[in-house]
Amino acid sequence: AGQLNDLGSAIGNAVEERLKSERFKAELITNVSHDLKTPLTSIINYVDLLKKTGVEDPKALEYIEVLDRKSQRLKKLTEDLVEASKASTGALTVNKERLGFIQLLDQALGEYEEKFEKSGLSPVCTAPDHELYVEADGRHLWRVIDNLLGNCVKYAMPGTRVYLDVKAWDGNVVLSVKNVSREPLNIPADRLMERFVRGEESRTTEGSGLGLSIARSLTELQGGTFRLDIDGDLFKAVVSFPECRALTAAPPL
């Protein structure tokens, strides 16, 4: 019995130390990102001013465009770092409400229409002709969908279709997103959900390797499940949330 108690105590201490380590990393990332925010905002503002000064020199315009793109990428990276850190430690506030899942997905697809077109991708969406409701945080759920679509834009093979399927299944609303990867996926699916891990080793596309990790953490934070499947160069993400049944009218008094 004494050995079991000692073992239980050791495990408890190890878990506590791990939690402290995670909290420390979260605080460090948040503080560093905050320190970067002020100078980065100044750089972005000065770049905007340069764009409005009527510069005509082609080389100077090229430099300004590079500055703009890189500073915006750094801004997105710092935001992703903070969100990934908070989501993984459960330090984000979750305000659940009844949401129309199909409506939210339609809005996201509308915003991504131009991005899909530029990437040579054709989205094919299959969904019921009636709304499916979930109880979730609207901002976090939007980020999950946004990250999944953004992942397609970055890594799907141009000239292919992206298949999105929404259905009610076994008390859940399930979204699956399938695409063909532009690069071989020589990596286990679980590894793709880790922070800073990307499926393509050449790193020819701009990305932080945080998108899928954030999507999984935010999904689980809201009581959902997140799964990845890889078969050759076929990538599939499956997100599931408990279905929230339609409200019924109150009986007359």
Per-region residue spans from a language model:
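Conserved catalytic submotifs in the C-terminal HATPase_c
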Residues: 95-99, 117, 122-132
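Conserved micro-motifs of the catalytic ATP-binding
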Residues: 89-94, 133-136
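Short helix-loop "hinge" at the ATP-lid/N-box region of the Bergerat-fold HATPase_c
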Residues: 152-153
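Short conserved segment of the HATPase_c
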Residues: 129, 184-197
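Conserved glycine-rich
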Residues: 223-224
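A conserved beta-strand-to-alpha-helix junction within the catalytic ATP-binding
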Residues: 95-109
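Short beta-strand/loop element within the Bergerat-fold HATPase_c
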Residues: 159-171
